[in-house]
């Protein structure tokens, strides 16, 4: 069930040369919570088509690094300071190699979403699995004090997953950016300041 939303944010993204309207979700989170800072090392999970990498690169600047990972390839040519990898974020070996080669990271972002079936319970369960993978990646790839932002569909698993984030991070917030479609069940969980293990 895939379709393109040709709304205000779609046209704004085209006009401003972003690869997807999803950039405005991250932009709103950044405006509110100041997750990204110049010089940060950022890991973007589920990075295709690349608008979150574009935006993160603008914030971290030339002294920072943005590493994007997605099952699909990303065709856009990014400036220096952006590394794009094709891989499965549920693979524990990927987490180890990312940490060794590019980490530790200051921020882990995840806009991952499952292919939706239209069956709300099944879709939220698949979203929860992706969220858990992102959280596990954050635990292994973030430096202590690092930040985490991840999409999650509201469902039965929400409160359990939120408690897991609260155990790992000092400050946790849940938000639904204005750029999210009104009928969408997506929300974003923000974890700031990863606790030392």
From Swiss-Prot:
GO MF assignments: rRNA (uridine-2'-O-)-methyltransferase activity
- The active site is formed by 151 (proton acceptor)
Q: Name the catalysed reactions.
A: uridine(2552) in 23S rRNA + S-adenosyl-L-methionine = 2'-O-methyluridine(2552) in 23S rRNA + S-adenosyl-L-homocysteine + H(+)
| Entry's EC annotation | 2.1.1.166
EC top class, as a word: transferase
Return the CDD domains for the record. Answer: AdoMet_MTases (cd02440)
Could you tell me where this protein is found in the cell?
Answer: Cytoplasm
Explain the purpose of this protein: Specifically methylates the uridine in position 2552 of 23S rRNA at the 2'-O position of the ribose in the fully assembled 50S ribosomal subunit.
Into which family does the record put it?
Belongs to the class I-like SAM-binding methyltransferase superfamily. RNA methyltransferase RlmE family.
- Would you tell me the protein name for this molecule? Ribosomal RNA large subunit methyltransferase E
Q: Which organism is it from?
A: Syntrophobacter fumaroxidans (strain DSM 10017 / MPOB)
Taxonomic lineage of this organism? Bacteria, Pseudomonadati, Thermodesulfobacteriota, Syntrophobacteria, Syntrophobacterales
Q: Which gene encodes it?
A: rlmE
């Amino acid at each position: 069930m895939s379709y393109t939303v040709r709304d205000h944010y779609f046209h704004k993204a085209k006009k401003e040369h972003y690869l997807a309207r999803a950039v405005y979700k991250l932009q709103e989170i950044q405006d509110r919570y100041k997750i990204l800072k110049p010089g940060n090392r950022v890991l973007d999970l589920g990075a295709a088509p690349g608008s979150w990498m574009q935006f993160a690169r603008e914030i971290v600047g030339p002294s920072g690094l943005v590493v994007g990972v997605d099952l699909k390839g990303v065709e856009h040519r990014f400036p220096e300071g952006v590394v794009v990898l094709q891989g499965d974020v549920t693979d524990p070996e990927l987490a180890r190699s990312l940490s060794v080669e590019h980490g530790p990271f200051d921020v882990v972002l995840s806009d991952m979403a499952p292919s939706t079936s239209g069956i709300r319970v099944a879709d939220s369960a698949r979203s929860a699995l992706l969220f858990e993978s992102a959280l596990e990646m954050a635990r292994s790839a973030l430096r202590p004090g690092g930040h985490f932002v991840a999409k999650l569909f509201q469902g039965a698993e929400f409160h359990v997953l939120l408690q897991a984030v609260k155990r790992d991070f000092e400050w946790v917030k849940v938000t639904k950016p204005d750029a999210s479609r009104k009928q969408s069940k997506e929300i974003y969980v923000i974890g700031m300041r990863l606790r030392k293990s």
